[in-house]
Amino acid sequence: MNYQSTKTFFLCPTRLLLTIILLIVISIPKQAAAAEHQVLPGIDVLAGQHFALLRGKRIGLITNQTGRTTAGVSTIDVLFHAPGVQLTALFSPEHGIRGEADDKLASSVDSSTGLPIYSLYGTSCRPLPDMLRGVDMLVYDIQNIGTRFYTYIGTLSLAMQAAERAGIPFVVLDRPNPIGGVDVQGAVSVPLLPKASAQRTEQQDSGCGALTSIHPLPTRHGMTVGELARLFNGEYGIGSNLTVIPMSGWQRDMYFDDTDLDWVNPSPNMKNLTEAVLYPGLGVLETTNLSVGRGTDHPFEMYGAPWLDAAAVARNLAARQVPGITFTACTFMPTTAGQPYRGTICNGVCVATMDREQLDPVQAGLHLIQAISEVHPERFKADAGFAVEVGDSDAWELLTQEGESPAEVAERWDSALEKFMSVRKKYLLY
């Protein structure tokens, strides 16, 4: 849609009426919105500012189904109808613009707006120069889940780098860290891509493998996406013309269910807050030869295989008395295509979070790994992705062969965590 068609759009009486109705919905007075919602995400704050930062600009929007106002209006629709704003292109992360895909996606066209959708999880994982022609500003609005190896923050970094190279500003509409902004846990990762620089080639960013460990971060980083953007920009050589639109009302000790915002699945198998809380530690089991419950009603809350002695593993874990969590023997059948043991009954352990304030999900994951290894020392295996997601190339051997306790493995990370915390505090907004 070019500038001339935008002017025509606002002259069409039917569309003008639609625009007025939509703007009434998204332009709720701040006091009324605050009374109904304790936390206002960045898109609501931007609307309250009458889109001043975006006016007169051709906007490229990086988003998915989680980009929405407190009233449930998608950020796509908000910006498409915002006065003085010309939305010209959409960019989708892993799982697509609607968050329903489990495979890599090709670029396409949005049926609602007619805008091009450029996939950032296909042949390229960052906006390429051709995609940015006719874009004056990139805007990012995606709900993340607080775990380093969830790919959306890798997409954030690569998009910021692309914006810097194209000489266009980058705007982040901030959203809550659903598992809080206080606890920081896990190993600080070794990045899979070298530090950003103007000398790096476009081809270096084309692969998606680095998205799970693009910068040195602990597994559970305790930062919002806006804070991460500030950290990436200031510490890792991006140097983008960055603006973060902060939330209103969010506090660091809030979990998502403290915000009064509606949960929207950020990916097909991230169906509730409990799974997000467990994911920093137990999500790494996707790199093993277990099913993690994908294709069930409770992914990341059950782990198993047809060969697993569930009762023995559950007894081993009960004896460990892992704080804040329980493990019970169960059976389940994964159904997602391409996942281990699809259509086969698996024996496993089901996980219940009893006290998330006491739970260290990273150490809980280490306990689960060690317990299964003790019961099945020959059968239980992990691929090369385990070291990447945990952030420690020695952790598997230490847990499964050397017999070091989860606490001893975690102690190896303390020095790097302390250094990260001293850097992190410079970029916190709340």
Describe each PLM feature range:
Residues 98-104, 171-203:
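Glycine-rich, charge-decorated loop segments at or immediately adjacent to ligand/cofactor-binding or catalytic sites
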Residues 202-279:
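Conserved anion/nucleotide-ligand pocket segment
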Residues 15-27:
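Bacterial N-terminal signal peptides
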Residues 144-156:
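Glycine/threonine-rich flexible loop motifs
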Residues 103-135, 147:
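Glycine-rich oxoanion-binding loops at beta->alpha junctions
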Residues 250-330:
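Glycine-rich, aromatic-lined ligand/substrate-binding cores of catalytic
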Residues 304-412:
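Conserved functional hotspot residues or short segments at active or partner-binding sites
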Residues 86-94, 173:
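Short internal beta-strands
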